């Protein structure tokens, strides 16, 4: 599946943070030779706005999230207290500690057991926590491959924990196309940046500057796509153009 070129958003908006906010993909991905060649000045203007590098968020932008399913899973394994905390968006310190790699997966499970005063095994805790994730549609994987084939350099930058990443890498990213070619996460992205491995998290601007440095790319030639506006603003603050896509639907449809 290629990017839907019928999406026509507003023009790129200058941002007080330094980068730009993009409302649609047509100004970013469509190559000038795909436009009316007679409109040379228009095509050149579009070419100047194209970005060579695209940094994707993971949650909602690629993988679906289902809070209620996660809550039901914790209740199913007898962790009603954690289910309540997830519903009320509490225990942020525990989840954040896992997200920035301050605690290991076994330590996360130990803390869950301590909070619940129970002996639920690690496997059940990890299963319930991973029920937050619902998968990656094949259409999104095809769109990523289409972008790579068109010459874009793709990167992933996610606030995530090792449990969720392991689930995504093992079960959601693997893909076989219509010609029988198989792909894994590393085939879609040139580099993968995880908060739990970097000990940094969005919206800290440092995670963006570090990703740019490790990738060897320039902010002014890079687009960042995220479902959260504060993360987009942080990217803009270091000169990256941002696309705020709250439901993860704009970028590929």
Identify the role of each PLM range.
Residues 31, 47-51, 56, 161-162, ...:
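Asp-based, Mg2+/Mn2+-dependent phosphohydrolase catalytic module
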């Amino acid at each position: 599946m290629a990017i839907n070129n019928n999406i026509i958003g507003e023009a790129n908006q200058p941002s007080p943070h330094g980068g730009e906010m993009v409302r649609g993909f047509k100004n970013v991905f469509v190559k000038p030779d795909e436009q009316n060649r007679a409109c040379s000045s228009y095509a050149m203007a579009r070419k100047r706005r194209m970005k060579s590098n695209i940094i994707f968020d993971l949650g909602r932008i690629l993988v679906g999230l289902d809070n209620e399913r996660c809550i039901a899973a914790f209740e199913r394994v007898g962790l009603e207290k954690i289910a309540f905390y997830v519903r009320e968006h509490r225990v942020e310190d525990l989840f954040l500690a896992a997200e920035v790699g301050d605690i290991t997966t076994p330590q996360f499970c130990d803390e869950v057991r301590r909070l619940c005063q129970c002996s639920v095994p690690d496997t059940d805790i990890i299963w319930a926590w991973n029920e937050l994730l619902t998968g990656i549609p094949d259409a999104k994987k095809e769109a990523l491959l289409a972008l790579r084939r068109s010459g874009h350099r793709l990167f992933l930058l996610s606030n995530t924990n090792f449990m969720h990443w392991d689930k995504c890498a093992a079960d959601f990213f693997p893909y076989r196309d219509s010609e029988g070619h198989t792909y894994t996460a590393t085939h879609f992205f040139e580099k993968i940046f995880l908060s739990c491995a970097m000990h940094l998290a969005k919206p800290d601007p440092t995670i963006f500057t570090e990703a740019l440095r490790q990738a060897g790319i320039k902010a002014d030639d890079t687009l960042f796509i995220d479902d959260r506006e504060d993360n987009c603003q942080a990217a803009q603050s270091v000169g990256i153009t941002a696309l705020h896509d709250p439901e993860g639907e704009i970028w590929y449809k």
